[in-house]
Amino acid sequence: MKLTREEKRIKRHRRIRKKISGTASRPRLCMYRSLNAFYASLVDDITGNAILTVSSLGKEYVDATGKRGGKSIEAVQKVAEILVQKAKEKGIDKAVFDRSGYLYHGKVKAFAEKCRELGLIN
């Protein structure tokens, strides 16, 4: 039986998660792409808590751009800027990037490069 695109992504994500883990001092930066929005979270895997979550549906994004639910590359980069700013406020200066099984291309690549440019990930 042939796997669907989402099943393939989940399979890749599980394989990646075996190797990547976040701590309180260096949390895991995971992301999710839906059809209408982009979500990013900093997660402490030891306690299982999300330290910080930002999305293109959130109040900070709407205040900064004036629109709700962007899914373009520019919207993803704005979400990255907001995430890095809030992380710095919480005292988090480094994170481990988890692409969540998505291919490193397009929006995922733009998000990672923006976070890297702003100094959150190596």
From Swiss-Prot:
Keyword Metal-binding found: no
Q: Has keyword Protein biosynthesis? A: no
Give the GO molecular function terms: 5S rRNA binding; structural constituent of ribosome
Keyword annotations of the record: Ribonucleoprotein, Ribosomal protein, RNA-binding, rRNA-binding
Q: Which InterPro entries match?
A: Ribosomal_uL18_bac-type, Ribosomal_uL18_bac/euk
One Gene Ontology cellular component:
cytosolic large ribosomal subunit
Q: Which GO terms describe its biological process?
A: translation
Question: Cross-referenced Pfam families, in alphabetical order?
Answer: Ribosomal_L18p
Cited HAMAP family? Ribosomal_uL18_B
Q: Which family does it belong to?
A: Belongs to the universal ribosomal protein uL18 family.
Q: Which function does this protein serve?
A: This is one of the proteins that bind and probably mediate the attachment of the 5S RNA into the large ribosomal subunit, where it forms part of the central protuberance.
- NCBIfam families, A to Z: L18_bact
Q: How does it assemble?
A: Part of the 50S ribosomal subunit; part of the 5S rRNA/L5/L18/L25 subcomplex. Contacts the 5S and 23S rRNAs.
Q: Spell out the protein name for this chain.
A: Large ribosomal subunit protein uL18
What is the species of this protein?
A: Hydrogenobaculum sp. (strain Y04AAS1)
Name of the gene encoding the protein in the UniProt record: rplR
